[in-house]
Amino acid sequence: MYKDDSLTLHMDLYQINMMQVYFNQGIHNKKAVFEVYFRQLPFKNGFAVFAGLEHIVNYLENLTFSETDIAYLKDLGYPKDFLDYLANLKLELTINSALEGDLVFANEPIFQDRKSVV
């Protein structure tokens, strides 16, 4: 573990690449809606029970790119202006979500956030 290990980079680098595209195109502050859903239910059930909202909210409220995160992305070749932007990123978003214990179904949004593209 690194001294400032964060969960921020526990994602596919595709997400970072798309953030860079939005940044390069100058649309990173444009408002957008993102939805989270799942395609298939486990165990061939007809529904699932939603749980973990507190963890999601806590993650989003504390999402920052640590010095180690930025150093790693620098080693991958991301440009300085983009890395500076990520180092200072502060999320401002609105969350709409299923409630703890709600029944949720495949291919239907269970979580939605409204924020800038990046």
Model-inferred region functions:
Residues 1-118:
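Ordered alpha/beta subdomains of enzyme catalytic regions
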